[in-house]
Amino acid sequence: MLETHDVSRCFSTPGGQFWALKDVSISAPEGKLTILKGRSGSGKTTLMNIMGALDKPTSGKVLLAGEDIVQLDERKRALIRRRSIGYVFQSVALIPMMSAYENVEYALRLAGMKSGRRERACECLRMVGLGQRMDHMPQEMSGGEQQRVAIARAIAHKPKVIFADEPTAELDTGTGLQVVKIFKDLCAGEGITIVMTTHDTGLMEIGDMVYELQDGEIIGK
């Protein structure tokens, strides 16, 4: 279970203080897909960054398996990011000179996996339906296929939680639905907790939990 309790985030701007989040409390159940919905500037990406240990709140708690990760020092937070969390961003950012397989295998090396990297990389690419495309370079793949490689890369080190920030924003509706179906399959088959941001109302009914943000506050669930 991943939870936030009364999370607020304030940024200093030339015009004064800007509260991007205001006392946000949500829960993302284990092995389920939780969607954060909202327009640009609603606070959903700020919330995701805090939940994913990429940023700290001004106040509030973030509990991962019962532990408040806000209180951990940066070394421990970095260890959690490396071992327990996977990230999928709107910009896929695959390494262009590496094949699909090499991109995933490289992520395993960075995660410190000593053996079994080839088997795990191939397994993850098969999970996302790219078993026959492992040797293809990113420029030889469609946008949807590249995003699937990014998902394979994110799950390779067997994280507890995956954070996906607008992963379907640059995809057509059909391809976007395929990506979300992969997320649902990973929740059901691998028990991974997935938190995803989107502004696409067509994806709302697919989430197990949906929270709507506006001006840094939860306005709907």
Segments (PLM) and residue ranges:
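ABC family nucleotide-binding domain
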Residues: L2-L213
